[in-house]
Amino acid sequence: MVREEVAGSTQTLQWKCVESRVDSKRLYYGRFILSPLRKGQADTVGIALRRALLGEIEGACITRAKFGSVPHEYSTIAGIEESVQEILLNLKEIVLRSNLYGVRDASICVKGPRYITAQDIILPPSVEIVDTAQPIANLTEPIDFCIDLQIKRDRGYQTELRKNYQDGSYPIDAVSMPVRNVNYSIFSCGNGNEKHEILFLEIWTNGSLTPKEALYEASRNLIDLFLPFLHAEEEGASFEENKNRFTPPLFTFQKRLTNLKKNKKGIPLNCIFIDQLELTSRTYNCLKRANIHTLLDLLSKTEEDLLRIDSFRMEDRKHIWDTLEKHLPIDLLKNKLSF
């Protein structure tokens, strides 16, 4: 973090991308500014965004590889220049772009002699390879070479215990971190009581998403994290009355709707996020993949729209309907929902 003094003017808080470039297929760069901020706010925002960008962004990667008749990962295979361990390390470096959740299968099946690159991976739908030229192995003899792969979307760095699996599969330490690096710097502007700060944020990604997309996802994650604190359970309740009382999940979808109906106010559907609906993780992930983030997004969809979502089932549709029917006013359902 760098702090400098510059001349500047005050204005409405806004952000802007001031630089964007593609250094290579696996290295994107973006530079953003947020201003004007009061003294101390730039540090608060910078630290939170940096942590969210490095630790909360999800990515897809290869997590397991299965070879035929290989006793251990340090083995060598006749006709292949690399050892099994080197092939696993090369597979670990493959950068994938995908919005799918859960485990997906992929494979490689080629005949030598030839070089094997990421382009040779047979992928499931909706999964793309960022750099098809990434090397995997070199077949030096006319042999058949086949690997079964598993792809998983996750976040952070996941390590697995090294052990020999009877089926010939080996785990690959998953690096689900699309953001490679984040820096931020703070510049002070103005004089005296009119002093403000400008936050500069630099983001480098691996090409599976752009810095702007990463910034959006990190911001969304922070909003979801702090959302419960925006709604008090009982306004005006004293600390003495509540200090020894524990109330489990206060900010559920049901309670928000109850309070809204009690106050006889219109329901702000765009302010109720789907993670408050207490859906199953499967249903929630299906909706998120379809960019359905709020109750307004959900109620804007028809049954046909939902059933077109990848992996969305009739059971998911029924679960959503039961939840909404139980907690939403029936007239709102009739007006908004076309199930």
From Swiss-Prot:
In plastids the minimal PEP RNA polymerase catalytic core is composed of four subunits: alpha, beta, beta', and beta''. When a (nuclear-encoded) sigma factor is associated with the core the holoenzyme is formed, which can initiate transcription. One of its GO terms (molecular function) is DNA binding. Its EC number is 2.7.7.6. It comes from the Eukaryota. Pfam families: RNA_pol_A_bac, RNA_pol_A_CTD, RNA_pol_L. It is found in: Plastid, Chloroplast. Keywords: Chloroplast, DNA-directed RNA polymerase, Nucleotidyltransferase, Plastid, Transcription, Transferase. One of its GO terms (cellular component) is mitochondrion. It is an enzyme of class 2 (transferase). Its main location: plastid. This is DNA-directed RNA polymerase subunit alpha.
